[in-house]
C-alpha cells in the first residue's frame, strides 16, 4: 500500500527525451538575487536553521507544475520558504506580506466595500506554491461578478489560521451572484426563471475587486468564463506577472497570488512528458519567482533571522572560492609529487589541508569525526571530497542527477550547464556522446568512462592526466593549464 505519491520531477538521470536535446553551455554570471539565495542557504545551514537534506526535500516536494516553471535558484527560494514556515522560523503571513510590499501587521483590515456595491471575485489563476493553500472561496465563483448584501464582521484569515499562524483579521462579506453570472455557458439549457435564481457566498475582502455599475453591466453582458472547480485546472485567462506591489497597501490580494499549483490537476502520461518545456524555460532566463526570492531574503533580514553583514560575508566567501585556484593547486602538486598524488587519492581532505585548503562545504571538522566499526561518522551537513584519477584506460566524469551537488569548496559555484536537466540526464546515459557532441572531447574507444553521480554527501573532483610537453614545468606554470572543466571531466588539460 502506498500512502503517498513520489513526484520524480527532480530525478532526471537517463531521461529518454533529454537524449535528443542539445546542452546549452552558455556561461553567464549568476544574477545578484541568485547569489543571495545561494548565500542565504549556506548561512541558514551554518546556523543550524535547516539542513541540506531539508532543502532537497523542499525542492522535491514542489508540485511538478511549479517545478517546470521555476529555475534552479527559484526552487531553492521556494524550498527555504516552505522549510522555515514549517519550523516556525517565520510565518507564511510574514513572507506573503513581504512579497506584497505591505508592512506586516496584526491590525484588522478596514472594510473597503459597502452593502449594495458591485464586486468581482478575483480569478484564481496565478502562482505561488511554497505551501498548499487553504482556500475558503469556492471555485465556481472565481472570476464572477456579484453584489454585496451584508458585512457580518471581521474574521481571522483562514489561510494563515490553517497553519497555526495569526494573520490579519479580514472583513467578511456575503456576496450575491445570479446563476447567469456564475454559469453563463448553461444559459441555453436553463429552466424558466433559473437565470435570475441566485447563490449567496461568504467571501473575504482580499478576494474582491470593486466594480462600477457600468463595468458590472458590461461584464454581465459579455460573460464567458470557465470557473475553477475541484476537478479542473485554474483558469489561465487572468495570468498576472509576479511583480512587487508597492501601491495602496489596502489592496490586499495575497489570496489570489496564493499558490495555485498544488491544486492543479496533474497528468502523468509519461514520467518525463513535460521535460522539454522545462528545459526551454531554463534556457530562456525567465524568472517568475524572482520577486518572491528577493522578498524572502529581505523579510528574513528584516526579521533578524540573518543579518546583512553575515549575508555579505558569505557572498564574499563564495566569490573567494570561485577565484581561489584551489583545484588547479591540488592538481599541480599531485603532478609534481607522486607521494602527494597518492595521498590526495586516498584522503583528499587531509592532503588538501596540508596546503591550507578546506574541502568541505560547511564547518564540520573531519578530524573530530566519531568512529563506528572503524569508519568515520560525520556530522550532519558534512561533505567529503573524493578525487578520482584519469588513466590511459579510464576517464572520469562528474555529475549529480538528483540536483547538482558540486565541489563548491574547491571550485566555487557550479556553471549553469552543470545544473541543467540536459546535462544531468545525458551524463549518466550517454557520456561518450555528450562529451563528443557538447564539449568536443573525443576519447579513444578503448578508454572507458566512469561517471560519478554525486547524489549524497560525497563530492568529486577529477585528477586529470598530466599532458606531454610539461616536463620541467613549475607548479605555478602547471596550474595555468588546469581548467574547471578538466576537474569535472568534461575537458582535459592541453598544451598550446
UniProtKB/Swiss-Prot annotation:
The cofactor remark states: Binds 1 Fe(3+) ion per subunit.
On this chain, the residues bearing Cysteine sulfinic acid (-SO2H) are: 403
| Record-linked InterPro entries | CN_Hdrase_a/SCN_Hdrase_g_sf, CN_Hdrtase_a/SCN_Hdrlase_g, CN_hydtase_beta-like_N, CN_hydtase_beta_C, CN_hydtase_beta_dom_C, Elect_transpt_acc-like_dom_sf
Q: In terms of domain of life, where is this protein from?
A: Eukaryota
Q: Which reaction does it catalyse?
A: an aliphatic primary amide = an aliphatic nitrile + H2O
Q: Which cofactor does it need?
A: Fe(3+)
Q: How is it modified after translation?
A: Oxidation on Cys-403 is essential for the activity.
Residues covered by region (Disordered): 229-269
What's the EC number here? 4.2.1.84
Q: Where does Fe(3+) bind?
A: 400, 403-405
Residues found modified as Cysteine sulfenic acid (-SOH)? 405
Record's keyword terms, sorted: Iron, Lyase, Metal-binding, Oxidation
Q: Basic and acidic residues composition bias: which ranges? A: 259-269
Q: Where is the composition biased (Basic residues)?
A: 237-258
Give GO terms: molecular function aspect only.
nitrile hydratase activity; transition metal ion binding
Described purpose of this protein according to its UniProt entry? NHase catalyzes the hydration of various nitrile compounds to the corresponding amides. Industrial production of acrylamide is now being developed using some of the enzymes of this class.
Family, per entry: In the N-terminal section; belongs to the nitrile hydratase subunit alpha family.
Name of this chain's protein: Probable nitrile hydratase
Organism of derivation:
Monosiga brevicollis
Amino acid at each position: 500500500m502506498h500512502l503517498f505519491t513520489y513526484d520524480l520531477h527532480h530525478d532526471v538521470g537517463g531521461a529518454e527525451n533529454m537524449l535528443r536535446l542539445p546542452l546549452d553551455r552558455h556561461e553567464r554570471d549568476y544574477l545578484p538575487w541568485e547569489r543571495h539565495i545561494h548565500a542565504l542557504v549556506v548561512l541558514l545551514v551554518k546556523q543550524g536553521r535547516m539542513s541540506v537534506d531539508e532543502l532537497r526535500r523542499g525542492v522535491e516536494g514542489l508540485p511538478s507544475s511549479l517545478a517546470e516553471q521555476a529555475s534552479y535558484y527559484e526552487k531553492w527560494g521556494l524550498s527555504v520558504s516552505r522549510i522555515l514556515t514549517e519550523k516556525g522560523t517565520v510565518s507564511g503571513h510574514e513572507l506573503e506580506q513581504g512579497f506584497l510590499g505591505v508592512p506586516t501587521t496584526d491590525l484588522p483590515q478596514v472594510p473597503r466595500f459597502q452593502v449594495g456595491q458591485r464586486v468581482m471575485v478575483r480569478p484564481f489563476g496565478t502562482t505561488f506554491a511554497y505551501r498548499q493553500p487553504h482556500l475558503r472561496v469556492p471555485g465556481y465563483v472565481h472570476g464572477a461578478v456579484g453584489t454585496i448584501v451584508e458585512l457580518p464582521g471581521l474574521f481571522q484569515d483562514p489561510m494563515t489560521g490553517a497553519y497555526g499562524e495569526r494573520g490579519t483579521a479580514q472583513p467578511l462579506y456575503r456576496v450575491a451572484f445570479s446563476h447567469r453570472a456564475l454559469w453563463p455557458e448553461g444559459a441555453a439549457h436553463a429552466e424558466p426563471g433559473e437565470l435570475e435564481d441566485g447563490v449567496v457566498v461568504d467571501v473575504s475582502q482580499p478576494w474582491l475587486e470593486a466594480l462600477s455599475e457600468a463595468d458590472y453591466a458590461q461584464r454581465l453582458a459579455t460573460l464567458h468564463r470557465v470557473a475553477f472547480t475541484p476537478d479542473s485546472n485554474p483558469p489561465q485567462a487572468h495570468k498576472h506577472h509576479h511583480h512587487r506591489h508597492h501601491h495602496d497597501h489596502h489592496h490586499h490580494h495575497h489570496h489570489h497570488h496564493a499558490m495555485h499549483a498544488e491544486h492543479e490537476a496533474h497528468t502523468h502520461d509519461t514520467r518525463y512528458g513535460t521535460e522539454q518545456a522545462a528545459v526551454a524555460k531554463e534556457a530562456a532566463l525567465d524568472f517568475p519567482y524572482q520577486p518572491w526570492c528577493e522578498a524572502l531574503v529581505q523579510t528574513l533580514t528584516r526579521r533578524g533571522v540573518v543579518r546583512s553583514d553575515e549575508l555579505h560575508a558569505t557572498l564574499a566567501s563564495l566569490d573567494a572560492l570561485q577565484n581561489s585556484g584551489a583545484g588547479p593547486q591540488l592538481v599541480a602538486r599531485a603532478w609534481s609529487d607522486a607521494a602527494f598524488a597518492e595521498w590526495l587519492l586516498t584522503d583528499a581532505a587531509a592532503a588538501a589541508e596540508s596546503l591550507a585548503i578546506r574541502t568541505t562545504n560547511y564547518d564540520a571538522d573531519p578530524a573530530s569525526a566519531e568512529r563506528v566499526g572503524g569508519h568515520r561518522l560525520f556530522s550532519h551537513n558534512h561533505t567529503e571530497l573524493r578525487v578520482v584519477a584519469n588513466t590511459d584506460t579510464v576517464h572520469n566524469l562528474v555529475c549529480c542527477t538528483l540536483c547538482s551537488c558540486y565541489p563548491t569548496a574547491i571550485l566555487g559555484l557550479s556553471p549553469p550547464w552543470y545544473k541543467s536537466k540536459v546535462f544531468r540526464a545525458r551524463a549518466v546515459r550517454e557520456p561518450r556522446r555528450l562529451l563528443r557532441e557538447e564539449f568536443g572531447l573525443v576519447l579513444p574507444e578503448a578508454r572507458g568512462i566512469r561517471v560519478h553521480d554525486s547524489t549524497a554527501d560525497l563530492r568529486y573532483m577529477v585528477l586529470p592526466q598530466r599532458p606531454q610537453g610539461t616536463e620541467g614545468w613549475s607548479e605555478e606554470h602547471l596550474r595555468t593549464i588546469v581548467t574547471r572543466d578538466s576537474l569535472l571531466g568534461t575537458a582535459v588539460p592541453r598544451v598550446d
